[in-house]
Amino acid sequence: MENEENRQKLDLELTGHSNSRLSVAQLGLLERISVSFDRITVVGGFIPERESWVKRHVESNNRIDLRDTGYDRFKCHALDNKVYVEYNRKQAQSMGRSEIRVEFNPNELCEEENQFVQFMFLDNMRDKHFSRIDLAFDVPVNLEDYYVMSDKSVKQTVFYGRNNKPETKYFGVRDSERYIRIYNKKKQLKEVKEEESEHDHLWRIEFELKRSMTNKWDKCFDDLHILQPDYLSIESFEEQAKIYYLMNEISAWSKIERSTKYRYKKKIKEISEVNLSDDLREVLSGQHKRLSEELHSYITISHHDKLYDFDFEL
């Protein structure tokens, strides 16, 4: 009994949580994890017959803030800066890239605003595809003491708060095809938007996907593990110390051989009763149809015979 109490006490000192743990699913939080697209960038070209129509309305619509314009170009913000559109046919031809780029956050658009973006811009484009998709999970769990690890070799950057606990973690590099952010969403809402979350804890796990990774959005975290390792399940104190050092000193991983890295990563997964990534995959599976249909709606070939429930002001 005394050994068990000592074990739990040491576990609290090392990990910040008790050794008696339950998975997110067991805690009844699974249905409270939300998943959505937090940013979308659609690129393509104008349907030739629609170019002049769009340009004329961009220059006259009071919901659009025109920043630059010319014979075959324009830049604008729409819907109170919720949407950014850039079009430059000459530059696209000279640089071999798409003519028009439409950027927006679906979470910030109401249904009527979403329809406005569709009708004004997306429905008038051809050869549409995604150059960027941000997939975001909002998790009502305190991720300060979770250990995040990838099976792949990726750069990791961690920023700590005043309590010396992690507040933001980055995996990868910004211009890569996949860039991962994990941060304290509750704190961000309070400091940036002056909003209070109803949850005791709220963290965001966000995948910024570019180029070819936009086609693999539903597989973007198959190599990622968000874990609660149980150090004390390892009998050898020397082995405990090595794993603790690797998990708390990022640079330590660069000092060991590849085969040793594989062995210790495997060991960390084995001693973790909870892998939050499993819960994220379950949530994504349940929402996959809805998310797929949403993406399809942005790039589907459309016709201008649709009726929309908004006033198209000129």
Where are the model-predicted features located?
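Helix-turn-helix DNA-binding segment
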Residues: 261-266
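Structured, helix-rich domain cores that form ligand/interaction pockets
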Residues: 1-256, 271-314
